[in-house]
């Protein structure tokens, strides 16, 4: 009976996971695919780009915990998306037909008469020889802070020279009981009445007891395990590991507390991508509940066009396939333009320049730029910075969301999807 209940829970988690993860079915893979994620117009610029030092993504640590978040077993939706984002998409070269003598059940071309399926040699090493090795990844679910720190220390100790270590943490900055998604309507006056429907939603998840002191802390809450101190990860906990190159992604309502790392490093300046403290959405506030859909910031980093559609309240049933493909072409063209801007000599901080040649990290940087520009133009100026992501060190002004070129890219994309009225463009 116990096993039955456990398996029933696992099946329920898988059904819930698949329901959220398959919202947009006919889309590009989350994994890095040379066909979709390299751009002919900017390829030569990236190839010619040379920094004084070049770092390669070798290891990544991924951890996520939010109360009632979408997961199955110990793999959360946010971690799954980021895990896929740091993998190469196989080209298919490793699928080989098993050579076998034809018999009564198998034809000479490798098809079985009964099923018509191609036999695949599952015993072979499932590694695509045409691709580089994937970065090594460690996944932790609801770790104690001491456990997380010990794993980080082990990876840093073994990190090869000229490599960088990516740390992705998705967690709440508050401990407390989820009271449901709260929302409020943003209005902008008669001149922009169309924006009156914009709703931002923010829900934090934590333990059953609310501590007013915890709500103002400068830490991430990793889960209800052990004493309160063992659940909290502070920016200072990561400082000893800045003796090695770090690429830190913090997706939290308290992400900006980790700005304290910048300037306090012990040897290597860390690259920081920090999420907004609150998500923003058009229309239904339910879209902003991370316990139902995963994090908006992580979705922008792993599936940017899907995140943009979610931002403006579009679903797969709302978008014609040809329109979606056209929007994807516009976004790819924008990414290509931004790559060229980033490759300009002397315009990029060394911290970003040394990781730009790495395809995984370059793609994350481009998607961060897209996320920041989209949210900057979507949210009202008086909303403040809590709805905007941030990065340290700063990226060049050429890719600032206030620049005319960046706004033109977002305007073209929003026009294609018929949602230009949802944004505030300075260029119009």
Regions found by a protein language model. Give the residues of each.
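Cytosolic small-GTPase signaling regions in large eukaryotic proteins
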Residues: 1-65, 101, 333-357, 364-366
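Active-site-proximal C-terminal subdomain of hydrolase catalytic domains
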Residues: 247-376
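Short coil/turn segments at secondary-structure boundaries
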Residues: 67, 73-79, 95-98, 152-153, ...
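C-terminal functional modules of predominantly eukaryotic multidomain proteins
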Residues: 86-87, 215, 220-223, 319-428
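A short, glycine/acidic-enriched catalytic loop
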Residues: 173-241, 279
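Eukaryotic intrinsically disordered and solvent-exposed regulatory patches
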Residues: 19-20, 32, 42-50, 69-70, ...
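Core residues of folded domains in eukaryotic genome-function proteins
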Residues: 56-59, 135, 161-166, 244-248, ...
């Amino acid at each position: 009976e116990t096993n039955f209940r456990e398996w029933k829970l696992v099946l329920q988690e898988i059904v819930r996971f698949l329901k959220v993860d398959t919202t947009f079915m006919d889309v590009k893979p989350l994994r890095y695919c040379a066909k979709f994620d390299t751009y002919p117009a900017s390829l030569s610029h990236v190839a010619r780009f040379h920094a004084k030092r070049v770092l390669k993504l070798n290891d990544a640590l991924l951890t996520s915990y939010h109360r009632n978040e979408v997961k199955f077993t110990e793999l959360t939706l946010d971690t799954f998306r980021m895990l896929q984002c740091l993998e190469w998409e196989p080209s298919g070269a490793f699928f080989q037909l098993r050579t076998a003598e034809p018999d009564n059940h198998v034809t000479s071309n490798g098809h079985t008469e009964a099923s018509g399926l191609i036999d695949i040699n599952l015993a072979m090493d499932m590694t695509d020889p045409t691709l580089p090795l994937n970065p090594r990844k460690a996944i932790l679910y609801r770790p104690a802070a001491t456990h997380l720190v010990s794993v980080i220390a082990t990876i840093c100790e073994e990190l090869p020279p000229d490599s960088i270590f990516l740390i992705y943490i998705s967690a709440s900055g508050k401990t407390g009981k989820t009271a449901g998604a709260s929302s409020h309507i943003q209005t902008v006056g008669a001149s922009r009445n169309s924006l009156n429907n914009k709703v931002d939603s923010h829900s934090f998840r934590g333990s059953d007891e609310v501590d007013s002191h915890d709500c103002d802390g400068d830490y991430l809450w990793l889960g209800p395990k052990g004493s309160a101190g063992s659940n909290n990860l502070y920016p200072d906990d990561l400082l000893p590991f800045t003796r090695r190159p770090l690429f830190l992604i913090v997706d939290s309502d308290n992400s900006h507390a980790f700005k304290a790392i910048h300037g306090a490093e012990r040897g290597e300046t860390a690259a920081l991508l920090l999420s907004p403290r609150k998500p923003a959405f058009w229309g239904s506030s339910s879209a902003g509940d991370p316990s139902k859909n995963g994090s908006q910031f992580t979705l922008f980093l792993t599936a940017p066009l899907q995140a943009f559609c979610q931002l403006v309240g579009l679903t797969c049933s709302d978008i014609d396939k040809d329109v979606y493909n056209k929007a994807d072409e516009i976004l790819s063209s924008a990414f290509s333009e931004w790559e060229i801007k980033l490759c300009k000599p002397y315009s990029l901080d060394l911290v970003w320049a040394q990781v730009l040649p790495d395809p995984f990290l370059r793609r994350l940087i481009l998607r961060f730029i897209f996320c920041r520009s989209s949210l900057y133009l979507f949210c009202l100026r008086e909303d403040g910075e809590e709805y905007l992501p941030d990065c340290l060190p700063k990226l060049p002004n050429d890719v600032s969301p206030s620049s005319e070129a960046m706004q033109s890219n977002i305007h073209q994309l929003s026009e294609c999807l018929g949602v230009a009225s949802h944004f505030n463009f300075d260029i119009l």
